[in-house]
């Protein structure tokens, strides 16, 4: 049976770990509340942006012969080069949060590799970047400290090169992969095709009440301008959504760790009591034996 001092040392160590995980859970809970509110507001803006683009694209598709003359809305049958931007956390201790994104990226890589399509992998977040570098997967470029602290200007700059390369025909598709926030206990994986814009986003039906007053001759020019903002905001929103999901995942992971530590302390206390009882029993036997031998 383990030495009493060793067991006491283990109890102290696990108890200290329990205090740490409990504190981390409380910190993540506080951060989650702020991140959740920001994600909700950002989601409304993103939805409105999609609505505006859908309406303008729908108008052009309905009214112009030949449809939309914009590569961002054109169906590309045989892509030769694809950009995949992924978002992971800069830190760990958040359960399977990062690995879900990594698995989705690996799946996309395998699918395009099987079709002999060149993939340019662009990473945001230290954990994902380190994983692919460790596994000798080439990264086109990467950045850290952006997923933990979303910055609109840096986010816009990061995705802008992919937007321009798509418009110039250097790439044929742009994907965004990240783990987003669904609720306090659930994260939702997103694999979004940013370009070409999904045709289901816009329909030919005229809206009952338009939110826009745009002259027909200006619609394509406005659409081209808005499509940049659409992609840039999709990038920025993914960072905000990912932060909320990260705090949610870490809160759950630390809650589980705290509960496990609590159970381990209970188990060690039982083990300690048994060891102490055994030691007392041994001492009593030795005393009784000594007394008996003196008779």
Curated annotation (Swiss-Prot):
GO biological process terms on file: proton motive force-driven plasma membrane ATP synthesis
Superkingdom of the source species: Bacteria
Protein name: ATP synthase gamma chain
Family matches, as InterPro entries: ATP_synth_F1_ATPase_gsu, ATP_synth_F1_gsu
Task performed by this protein: Produces ATP from ADP in the presence of a proton gradient across the membrane. The gamma chain is believed to be important in regulating ATPase activity and the flow of protons through the CF(0) complex.
Signal sequence, renumbered to the chain: none
Family: Belongs to the ATPase gamma chain family.
Organism: Sulfurimonas denitrificans (strain ATCC 33889 / DSM 1251) (Thiomicrospira denitrificans (strain ATCC 33889 / DSM 1251))
Main location: membrane
Recorded GO CC terms: plasma membrane; proton-transporting ATP synthase complex
Keyword Repeat: no
Protein's membrane topology: Peripheral membrane protein
Pfam name, any one: ATP-synt
Complex formation: F-type ATPases have 2 components, CF(1) - the catalytic core - and CF(0) - the membrane proton channel. CF(1) has five subunits: alpha(3), beta(3), gamma(1), delta(1), epsilon(1). CF(0) has three main subunits: a, b and c.
Cell location: Cell inner membrane
GO MF terms held by the record: ATP binding; proton-transporting ATP synthase activity, rotational mechanism
Keyword Metal-binding annotated: no
Keywords: ATP synthesis, Cell inner membrane, Cell membrane, CF(1), Hydrogen ion transport, Ion transport, Membrane, Transport
């Amino acid at each position: 049976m383990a030495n009493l001092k060793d067991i006491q040392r283990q109890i102290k160590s696990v108890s200290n770990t329990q205090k740490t995980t409990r504190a981390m859970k409380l910190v993540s809970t506080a951060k989650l509340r702020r991140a959740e509110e920001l994600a909700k507001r950002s989601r409304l803006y993103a939805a409105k942006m999609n609505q505006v683009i859908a309406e303008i694209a729908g108008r052009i598709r309905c009214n112009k012969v030949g449809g939309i003359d914009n590569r961002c809305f054109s169906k590309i049958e045989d892509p030769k080069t694809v950009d995949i931007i992924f978002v992971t956390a800069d830190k760990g201790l958040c359960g399977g949060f990062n690995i879900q994104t990594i698995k989705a990226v690996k799946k996309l890589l395998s699918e395009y590799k099987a079709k002999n399509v060149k993939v340019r992998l662009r990473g945001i977040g230290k954990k994902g970047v380190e994983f692919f570098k460790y596994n000798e997967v080439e990264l086109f470029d990467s950045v850290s400290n952006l997923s933990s602290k979303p910055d609109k200007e840096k986010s816009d700059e990061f995705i802008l090169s992919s937007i321009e390369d798509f418009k110039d025909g250097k790439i044929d598709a742009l994907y965004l992969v990240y783990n987003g926030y669904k609720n306090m206990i659930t994260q939702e994986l997103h694999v979004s095709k940013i370009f070409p814009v999904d045709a289901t986003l816009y329909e030919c039906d005229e809206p009952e009440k338009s939110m826009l007053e745009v002259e027909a001759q200006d619609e394509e020019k406005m659409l081209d301008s808005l499509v940049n903002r659409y992609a840039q905001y999709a990038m920025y929103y993914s960072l905000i959504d990912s932060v909320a999901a990260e705090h949610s995942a870490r809160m759950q992971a630390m809650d589980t760790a705290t509960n496990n530590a609590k159970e381990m302390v209970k188990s060690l206390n039982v083990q300690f009591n048994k060891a102490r009882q055994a030691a007392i029993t041994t001492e009593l036997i030795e005393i009784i034996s000594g007394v008996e031998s003196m008779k």
